[in-house]
């Protein structure tokens, strides 16, 4: 397995070659130990854990999705979020070149500063976006409750509340 600019590119065009498969279990165990132990700042730990997971690249497919999912789970695991609701995929996708370059700089230099600066910026931006989304949902809830909450049916308001408590997409 290797990572190239385009799917199907030969290994000669690889931009990253993950460790050989016989090292993967040890590297994943090391990553889990890192997540569970230590006193580092939670965001630093989440950022480094994401990089390390991407570097180990333990699966043939889905590493990016799982690596991005790891971020809110690390923060949640360390009890800094009530729910694992911080999703950076949108930001990483919108800034893909910068994201990949920041990860690659760690590979080249062993220095996490550029990666962590990008990571912190992505967290801050995504938190702002999440806050806006939550505010919009509350506003929508208030509008709908005000519009339909005074209806004649005693079931309408509980129905509206149920939709907002357990949305189905």
Q: How does the language model describe each region?
A:
Residues 1-169:
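FIC/Doc superfamily catalytic core
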